[in-house]
């Protein structure tokens, strides 16, 4: 292993150097790399390689050895020496390592002046050299776990674009004019007009958004029959006591002329909010919405009575054959689309649904005693905490009845609700219930809930994840990386065949079982119903793995999974990320514009596969166009045997027992395994019907319990 720095010099500023005054100097730089040696005369630096003269804004490479320094001399056309400085390469590499492999600094020159230097850290391996001290000192980009991000869910109501928002100051709802309580994301705020509301008041909004272009066009053409247009008569007002804006909900600041007051209805608003206020002068949105809801429910009841009357009297205008007329028509049929794809869905007392339309099915329900089974967290012993985040915690748990070990993911309902992730949680449950059909997806046994938490009971994979293993060996050899890549391909293609885009493929989400086979985990970012030409445009994923089409705001499909697969394969083979940046802005620019660095020692087939996966035109990317299984890197793979797990993995994790936790990060294992406390006020005010269809039981768990 021979690490090196790729260095660029630019923006030389001579300052007030006397040598530069008068005529144009046209400075250029000379770079001398010197080695530290011991001699008879003591310690000294000797130049062994020729002097380099890199042009401004170009790059050159310098290998890193302890004691090696780089002397930079700035010269001029008519001046022998303007300025100089000396940089220790080892210290520069350490600085790069702390900044995700890249740094940018201003070098102060002597006697005067400065220049901008960019440096990027790389690894270079030859087949004959062993890994040296730089591995043990951590010169790798993959030194920490990276969390996923997701664009806030947008609720489109009357052209408003409401997103869950944290209000840092006291805020009042613009619909009911009551205080918005809470500690996290207390309510919704429109991204267009800044209107603030309670989450519970989102169905009571009757005014169309004033900041939406769609609204202005619809208003122009009078497309909606129901329309209210009562303009306010605002005038500047001096408030003598603290007053809140009735549009954005925040305080009116200032000592005088703090805001505007409507002469007719007394509404108070900021100056900046005046143009965003809807024309609802004198109208109570809450009462109006309740009246409209009552009218709608009355109309629905009338339609239902009319429908029942038609069923009782029979069809009048259409003649039907006697055989059809005489058939008994049930008053209500179960909806096939709401049945679980497999297993048995059972409902806890919190989930009980309206049974007014229940039709008994004796033939189907004859032998289904498991419907009465209700699991609870007290049926398990929590031994260790395997991980945690803002969402909740993951525990190693033992089922008391059978002494079998499971991984239980516990989500906090208040956090799920505050982050607007109810639908994501339901998607994760549906994908996990489907995962039993494939060997390389994490299998779920059941889900259940309490008033405060949601629980996923999944198989315990004690081999750890790929991020844990790559931190100890820094990179995988070609055969091991190829094996993992092939199994991941099978898992991804199964998800895609079911219309599911995964969107969060990374080392952290690839687990190993006790035999060394991979399992794809964590389906919270998945997007369903993506068959055919269907596309979506949600901004989500882990920053290092996000595809360029997501960053550009384009609509996308499963092509983004193949880009993420390329990043993951690059990290497995090379041991660092293909794209770098000191912050997300630089990283995203690198993903959109930069070409990854491929070391000389990388196998030709591996490089070819990576190049085809990093194509920025989604429709031309391998996996979207062409069969990725036919790539030369996988020519030794028998795909049928691989899917049947008949090929032995090249690496088998060290597992001492079914409950062994040695392959997980130690930072969590020492913590006491207990559930987090929830926001009681929020839990008590929460509509539990949002989680009504969460509970599920797989036939595998059914057999264990019975």
From Swiss-Prot:
Organism: Homo sapiens (Human)
Source species, domain of life: Eukaryota
Domain (Protein kinase): residue spans on this chain: 380-634
Protein biosynthesis is among the record's keywords: no
GO cellular component: aggresome; centriolar satellite; cytosol; immunological synapse; plasma membrane
UniProt cross-references to SUPFAM superfamilies, sorted A to Z: C2 domain (Calcium/lipid-binding domain, CaLB), Cysteine-rich domain, Protein kinase-like (PK-like)
Binding site for ATP: 386-394, 409
Positions of Phorbol-ester/DAG-type zinc fingers: 159-209, 231-281
Quaternary structure and interacting proteins, as annotated: Part of a lipid raft complex composed at least of BCL10, CARD11, MALT1 and IKBKB. Interacts with GLRX3 (via N-terminus). Interacts with ECT2. Interacts with CCDC88A/GIV; the interaction leads to phosphorylation of CCDC88A and inhibition of its guanine nucleotide exchange factor activity. Interacts with PRKCH upstream open reading frame 2; the interaction leads to inhibition of kinase activity. Interacts with CD28.
This protein's name: Protein kinase C theta type
Keyword Metal-binding in record: yes
């Amino acid at each position: 292993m021979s690490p090196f720095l790729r260095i660029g010099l630019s923006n030389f500023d001579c300052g007030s150097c006397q040598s530069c005054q008068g005529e144009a100097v046209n400075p250029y730089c000379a770079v001398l790399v010197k080695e530290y040696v011991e001699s008879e005369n003591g310690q000294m630096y000797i130049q062994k390689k020729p002097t380099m003269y890199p042009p401004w804004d170009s790059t050159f490479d310098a290998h890193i050895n302890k004691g090696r320094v780089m002397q930079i001399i700035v010269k001029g056309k008519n001046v022998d020496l303007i300025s100089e400085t000396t940089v220790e390469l080892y210290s520069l590499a350490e600085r790069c390592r702390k900044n995700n492999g890249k740094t940018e600094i201003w070098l102060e020159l002597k006697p005067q002046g400065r220049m901008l230097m960019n440096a990027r850290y790389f690894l270079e391996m030859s087949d004959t050299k062993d890994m040296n001290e730089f591995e043990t000192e951590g010169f790798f980009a993959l030194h920490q776990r990276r969390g996923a991000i997701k664009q806030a869910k947008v609720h489109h109501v009357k052209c408003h674009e409401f997103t869950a928002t944290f209000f840092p100051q006291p805020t009042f709802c613009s619909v009911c004019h009551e205080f918005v309580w809470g500690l996290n994301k207390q309510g919704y705020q429109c991204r267009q007009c800044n209107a603030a509301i309670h989450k519970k008041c989102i169905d009571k909004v009757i005014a169309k958004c004033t900041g939406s272009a769609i609204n202005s066009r619809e208003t122009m053409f009078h497309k909606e029959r129901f329309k209210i247009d009562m303009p306010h008569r605002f005038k500047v007002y001096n408030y003598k006591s603290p007053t809140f804006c009735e549009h954005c909900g925040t305080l009116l600041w200032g000592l005088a002329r703090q805001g505007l007051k409507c002469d007719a209805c007394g509404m108070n608003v900021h100056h900046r909010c005046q143009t965003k206020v809807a024309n609802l002068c004198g109208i109570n949105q809450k009462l109006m919405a309740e009246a409209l809801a009552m009218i709608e429910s009355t109309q629905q009841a009338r339609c239902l009575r009319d429908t029942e009357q038609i069923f009782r009297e029979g069809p009048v205008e259409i003649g039907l054959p006697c055989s059809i007329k005489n058939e008994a028509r049930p008053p209500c049929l179960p909806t096939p689309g709401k049945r679980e794809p497999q297993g048995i869905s059972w409902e806890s007392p919190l989930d009980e649904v309206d049974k007014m339309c229940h039709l008994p099915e004796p033939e189907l329900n004859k032998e289904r005693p498991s419907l009465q089974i209700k699991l609870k967290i007290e049926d398990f012993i929590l031994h260790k905490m395997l991980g945690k985040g803002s969402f909740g915690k993951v525990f190693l748990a033992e089922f008391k009845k059978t002494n079998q070990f499971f991984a239980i993911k516990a989500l906090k309902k208040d956090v799920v609700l505050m982050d607007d992730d109810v639908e994501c949680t339901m998607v994760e449950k549906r994908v996990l219930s489907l995962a039993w059909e494939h060997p390389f997806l994490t299998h779920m046994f059941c889900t259940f809930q309490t008033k405060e938490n949601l629980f996923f009971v999944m198989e315990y994979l004690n081999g750890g994840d790929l991020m844990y293993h790559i931190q100890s060996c820094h990179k995988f050899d070609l055969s091991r990386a190829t094996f993992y890549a092939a199994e991941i391909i099978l898992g991804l293609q199964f998800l895609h065949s079911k219309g599911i885009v995964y969107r969060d493929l990374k080392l952290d989400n690839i687990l190993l079982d006790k035999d060394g086979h991979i399992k794809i985990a964590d389906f919270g970012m998945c997007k369903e119903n993506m068959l055919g030409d269907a596309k979506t445009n949600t901004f989500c994923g882990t920053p290092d793995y996000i595809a360029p089409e997501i960053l550009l705001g384009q609509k996308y499909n499963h092509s983004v999974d193949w880009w993420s697969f390329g990043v993951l394969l690059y990290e497995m083979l090379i041991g660092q990320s293909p794209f770098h940046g000191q912050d997300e802005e630089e990283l995203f620019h690198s993903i959109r514009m930069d070409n990854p660095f491929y070391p000389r020692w990388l196998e030709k087939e591996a490089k070819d596969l990576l190049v085809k996966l990093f194509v920025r035109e989604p429709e031309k990317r391998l996996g979207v166009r062409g069969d990725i299984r036919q790539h030369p890197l996988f020519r030794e793979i028998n795909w049928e045997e691989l899917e049947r797990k008949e090929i032995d993995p090249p690496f088998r994790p060290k597992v001492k027992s079914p409950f062994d936790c040695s392959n997980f990060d130690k930072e969590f294992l020492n913590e006491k395994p207990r559930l987090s406390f929830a926001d009681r006020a929020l839990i008590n005010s929460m509509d539990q019907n949002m989680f009504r269809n969460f509970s599920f039981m797989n036939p595998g768990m059914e057999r264990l319990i019975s």
